[in-house]
């Protein structure tokens, strides 16, 4: 009896994973049958609804938080110059004292040891810059905590949005494992002439579990165009706001750390978009439609957020 139960326990986790994906596929099938809406309308509508319920509130929350962070960063921008001036003044004063003590005719042993210790406490320009930046980050952290806009909260949106996208993609992939023809659209009779069929009838006869064989590059081109527009728009926004985001370094300097980070993110995003275009050539029509709709929603959402809560320039 014990030996018979072991395989079921061993595969329990895997079966739960496949069961959750099957539940998503079954939910779409039930929604399709109950509503009578065609698949090509149901998937975009469901995508907009899911993004509006789960990611839009988090996106608004994050946008407001980032704008507040930029405002607070402008407040602490005055800290490094003041700290640099104070540290430089202390260093110069220590140097003057060192010159005064070394100019005496006779120095005791205690005076010599004290002079050596003061020399160790003197700061170089690089150390002064590092200490001023450290003080700025310390005060910035205190301000962020005071206004409840801590940096770790910026990771909440990706932790929700990415798993949602992956889960939906896998669920639709499970849905299109077998042949999927839309029963909520008109179909042509077997003996009907092809010239007499309308475009709705032609779409209704498509197998949505396969790529679009009639125009194999149409969907990848649409997906790639929308994705690249989204990437370049976000990249332009990131580069324009890098000055307010960093506080010290500027994105116009190609050698700055901020500029290199922004360029690295944009390069990785462009490469992932190209990879997604290649995958869409072999993906089902339904899955590619979900990806296109998600990209369109992101583009519209970012435009609206930029109008309502623009980043600080």
From Swiss-Prot:
Which InterPro entries does the protein's record reference? YidC/ALB3/OXA1/COX18
For the Mitochondrial matrix compartment, the record's topological domain ranges are 230-272
Could you state a single Gene Ontology molecular function term?
Answer: membrane insertase activity
Q: Where can this protein be found?
A: Mitochondrion inner membrane
Q: Which family does it belong to?
A: Belongs to the OXA1/ALB3/YidC family.
Q: What is this protein called?
A: Cytochrome c oxidase assembly protein COX18, mitochondrial
Membrane side Mitochondrial intermembrane: which residues? Answer: 294-313
Q: Which GO terms describe its biological process?
A: mitochondrial cytochrome c oxidase assembly; protein insertion into mitochondrial inner membrane from matrix
Native source species: Kluyveromyces lactis (strain ATCC 8585 / CBS 2359 / DSM 70799 / NBRC 1267 / NRRL Y-1140 / WM37) (Yeast)
Q: Which UniProt keywords apply?
A: Membrane, Mitochondrion, Mitochondrion inner membrane, Transit peptide, Transmembrane, Transmembrane helix
- Show the stretches that span the lipid bilayer: 209-229, 273-293
User: Which GO terms of the cellular component aspect does the record hold?
Assistant: mitochondrial inner membrane
Report the membrane topology from the UniProt record.
Multi-pass membrane protein
Q: Does the keyword Mitochondrion apply?
A: yes
